[in-house]
Regions:
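Non-catalytic beta/alpha edge segments that cap or flank active sites
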Residues: 1-178
Length: 178
């Protein structure tokens, strides 16, 4: 079983002013691609540095999530602190994920350069910051997801299987399990 944490960062959604659709978009995409049994953990919280850190730590250390996806809080606004909170709790930061997501997003919108998305690992958990809009989530996740299952292998997490007709991932031949 793969354990996945989804953390939505939104002051207004956390107050119930509108329904979070970004977290559900992530869940739907992952259910489409991943063939393992999945258990999801889901939180909607305000853009608060300490709250983000504590929830990420809970997803990693207590709930033992293999994958953790954040949505929102990656722009330049004063309250956008998701990347800082992510980096603060990670053992290792993986900047290539953010670099590729920005490159891909620039094909759709020039303001993508304002994004500060990042990724990292804590213990056996992989963490990825995603944008707050469902369309942008898919646009960012598609180019980087092929590397995520092998990254999880390398950090000792559970083996993630995908429907190759929908999402073909990369692993060296020596890392492929039949």
């Amino acid at each position: 079983m793969i354990r996945i944490g989804i953390l939505t960062l939104s002051d207004r959604a956390s107050k119930g002013e509108y329904k979070d659709i970004s977290g559900n978009a992530i869940r739907e995409i992952l259910q489409e691609w991943i063939t393992n049994e999945i258990k999801f953990f889901y939180e909607v919280i305000p853009d608060d540095f300490e709250l983000i850190k504590s929830n990420l730590i809970k997803f990693c250390d207590e709930l033992n999530c293999d994958l953790i996806f954040t949505t929102g809080g990656t722009g330049p606004a004063l309250r956008d602190v998701t990347p800082e909170a992510t980096e603060a709790i990670c053992d290792k930061v993986l900047p290539g994920f953010g670099e590729l997501m920005r490159m891909e997003s620039l094909k759709f919108v020039p303001t993508a350069i304002l994004s500060r998305q990042t990724a990292g690992v804590r213990n056996k958990s992989f963490i990825l910051n995603l944008p707050g809009q469902p369309k942008a989530i898919r646009e960012c996740l598609e180019p980087v997801f092929p590397a995520i299952p092998y990254c999880v292998d390398l950090i000792g997490g559970n083996y993630i299987k995908t429907d190759e007709s929908k999402m073909k991932v990369f692993r060296p031949k020596s890392a492929i399990k039949k």
